[in-house]
């Protein structure tokens, strides 16, 4: 069964998705990673995406849907996909249903990690990602791990779009645009809301219990 993980930027969707991948042999389809890969490719589309992200804006549905379709046609895992960061609005939710129907697939569980803006601010402003191994640490919560990071502290970098004004803008935009999507999926009995402010392991255990159902 496929899964959708909802939650504002910094809610820990990526961390939880990685846990599901390891434990349940899922494939993580992150629109954030798709967009960043396109930016790294230096294509014209990638340049446009970088401008939008740097200004705290979301890219258009047309761009996201194009990248998503390209990925779906290359997926090796049927009915074992975690959609991380998609859909963001009702139009995308409808588009996802259409795409999955083309591949004879459906959504088995929809999970919303609910986290307040105050906590999100600290999580994102302190977030650092290793440019070599992609490990993510937080300067507020992982000071010892940062000092002992095997790749070296010099490889831990902050993302360009991680500044307070943009964090607030992204959070408010996400919550306002995603509310209709949550209402769209909450009508389904497979929709679950989880307090995303807890410890990572506690949240992981809750998700594992959901996936057993």
UniProtKB/Swiss-Prot annotation:
Region (NMP), start-end ranges: 30-59
EC assignment: 2.7.4.3
Swiss-Prot/TrEMBL keywords: ATP-binding, Cytoplasm, Kinase, Nucleotide biosynthesis, Nucleotide-binding, Transferase
InterPro entries named among the record's database cross-references: Adenyl_kin_sub, Adenylat/UMP-CMP_kin, Adenylat_kinase_CS, P-loop_NTPase
One function term, GO molecular function aspect: adenylate kinase activity
Binding-site list for AMP: 31, 36, 57-59, 85-88, 92, 159, 170
Binding site for ATP: 10-15, 127, 198
Positions of the UniProt region annotated as LID: 126-162
Pathway noted in the entry: Purine metabolism; AMP biosynthesis via salvage pathway; AMP from ADP: step 1/1
Subunit composition and interactions: Monomer.
PANTHER family registered for this protein in UniProt: NUCLEOTIDE KINASE
Family matches, as NCBIfam families: adk, PRK00279.1-3
HAMAP family: Adenylate_kinase_Adk
Protein name listed in UniProt: Adenylate kinase
Organism from which the protein derives: Pelagibacter ubique (strain HTCC1062)
Lineage: Bacteria, Pseudomonadati, Pseudomonadota, Alphaproteobacteria, Candidatus Pelagibacterales
Gene name linked to the record: adk
